[in-house]
UniProtKB/Swiss-Prot annotation:
Localization (cell): Plastid, Chloroplast
Family: Belongs to the bacterial ribosomal protein bL33 family.
Single GO biological process annotation from the record: translation
NCBIfam families: PRK00504.1 (NF001764), PRK00595.1 (NF001860), rpmG_bact (TIGR01023)
Pfam families (UniProt xref): Ribosomal_L33
Keywords: Chloroplast, Plastid, Ribonucleoprotein, Ribosomal protein
Protein name: Large ribosomal subunit protein bL33c
GO cellular component: chloroplast; ribonucleoprotein complex; ribosome
Lineage, top ranks: Eukaryota, Viridiplantae, Streptophyta, Zygnematophyceae, Zygnematophycidae
Database matches in PANTHER family: 50S RIBOSOMAL PROTEIN L33, CHLOROPLASTIC (PTHR43168), LARGE RIBOSOMAL SUBUNIT PROTEIN BL33C (PTHR43168:SF2)
Entry-linked HAMAP family: Ribosomal_bL33
InterPro entries: Ribosomal_bL33 (IPR001705), Ribosomal_bL33_CS (IPR018264), Ribosomal_bL33_sf (IPR038584), Ribosomal_zn-bd (IPR011332)
Broad class of where this protein is predominantly found: plastid
PROSITE patterns: RIBOSOMAL_L33
Originating organism: Staurastrum punctulatum
């Protein structure tokens, strides 16, 4: 009897500030990959992470793959 692996999924977090910000250090959009538990957090995940393109801590939201 193995564990059900479908509960924990891999998601991508994308910076919400990068598309609007014109004064970036270099072009591009910051993305992080992480895992979340579907039972504990059924809605979209939002975290404050460091964006190397904006050189700031910004809000990163979960995106669809």
């Amino acid at each position: 009897m193995g564990k059900n692996k479908d509960v924990r999924i891999t998601i991508t977090l994308e910076c919400t500030n990068c598309p609007q910000n014109k004064l970036k250090r270099y072009p591009g959009i910051s993305r992080y990959t992480t895992q979340k538990n579907r039972r504990n957090t059924p809605n979209r995940l939002e975290l404050k992470k460091f964006c190397p393109h904006c050189s700031l801590h910004t809000l990163h939201k979960e995106i669809k793959k």
